[in-house]
Curated annotation (Swiss-Prot):
Family per similarity comment: Belongs to the LCL2 family.
Database matches in PANTHER family: LONG CHRONOLOGICAL LIFESPAN PROTEIN 2
Gene name linked to the record: LCL2
Full protein name: Long chronological lifespan protein 2
Keywords for this protein: Signal
Keyword flag Signal: yes
UniProt source species: Pyricularia oryzae (strain 70-15 / ATCC MYA-4617 / FGSC 8958) (Rice blast fungus)
Signal sequence annotation: 1-20
Amino acid sequence: MQSPVLLQLLLLALMGTVSAQFGGFFDQMFGGGGGGGGGQQQRQEQNVPSDSAWYRSNVDAAVCSNYLCPDTLACVHFPHHCPCPFPDHEDKFELAEGQRICVSRGGFKAGEAARKVELARKGLL
């Protein structure tokens, strides 16, 4: 009679060990929710929607009596005064037509982005 009880206890102990060791793996592989662990659930943040509604709502909420920069939503007097979205990684160049472009510094030597912009202006690039 002791054998079935002992076997059940042994199986129960093994299931707890397997759940403790592999519970996180199974939760990640199969979407969580079930079994083992301490019942912890991770809450993931929502991605912004893939349509333009989020952007439009931010544009509509922006208050600007001058020019609202489309990429940074900064309020400036003239379009060529718009800042770059990532000023730590981009150089800003004002074009002759009163517009500006932002060029990634991405691994270029100092002044290399400016040289490439100048070559492009001349049609050599």
